[in-house]
Amino acid sequence: MKGEKYTRFERARIVGARALQIFMGAPVLIRTDSIDPLEIALEEMRLGVIPITVKRDRKR
């Protein structure tokens, strides 16, 4: 996922979904002192380790 370009809407959806996963007890994929799921998800996004992909429709 590193280097892939996401729209601002895709980034918001990915980070939000990942923050919810973390809040619900999913394992954190990075070492961090933070306990805020949103901060953790943002850091995971920055590092490119979020295990979520985006499937786009082809443009017509």
From Swiss-Prot:
<dbReference type="InterPro" id="IPR020708">
    <property type="entry name" value="DNA-dir_RNA_polK_14-18kDa_CS"/>
</dbReference>
<dbReference type="InterPro" id="IPR006111">
    <property type="entry name" value="Rpo6/Rpb6"/>
</dbReference>
<dbReference type="GO" id="GO:0005737">
    <property type="term" value="C:cytoplasm"/>
</dbReference>
<keyword id="KW-0240">DNA-directed RNA polymerase</keyword>
<dbReference type="GO" id="GO:0000428">
    <property type="term" value="C:DNA-directed RNA polymerase complex"/>
</dbReference>
<keyword id="KW-0963">Cytoplasm</keyword>
<dbReference type="InterPro" id="IPR006110">
    <property type="entry name" value="Pol_omega/Rpo6/RPB6"/>
</dbReference>
<comment type="subunit">
    <text>Part of the RNA polymerase complex.</text>
</comment>
<keyword id="KW-0804">Transcription</keyword>
<comment type="function">
    <text>DNA-dependent RNA polymerase (RNAP) catalyzes the transcription of DNA into RNA using the four ribonucleoside triphosphates as substrates.</text>
</comment>
<dbReference type="GO" id="GO:0006360">
    <property type="term" value="P:transcription by RNA polymerase I"/>
</dbReference>
<dbReference type="GO" id="GO:0006366">
    <property type="term" value="P:transcription by RNA polymerase II"/>
</dbReference>
<keyword id="KW-0548">Nucleotidyltransferase</keyword>
<dbReference type="GO" id="GO:0003677">
    <property type="term" value="F:DNA binding"/>
</dbReference>
<dbReference type="GO" id="GO:0003899">
    <property type="term" value="F:DNA-directed RNA polymerase activity"/>
</dbReference>
<comment type="similarity">
    <text>Belongs to the archaeal Rpo6/eukaryotic RPB6 RNA polymerase subunit family.</text>
</comment>
<dbReference type="Pfam" id="PF01192">
    <property type="entry name" value="RNA_pol_Rpb6"/>
</dbReference>
<dbReference type="GO" id="GO:0042797">
    <property type="term" value="P:tRNA transcription by RNA polymerase III"/>
</dbReference>
<dbReference type="InterPro" id="IPR036161">
    <property type="entry name" value="RPB6/omega-like_sf"/>
</dbReference>
<protein>
    <recommendedName>
        <fullName>DNA-directed RNA polymerase subunit Rpo6</fullName>
        <ecNumber>2.7.7.6</ecNumber>
    </recommendedName>
</protein>
<keyword id="KW-0808">Transferase</keyword>
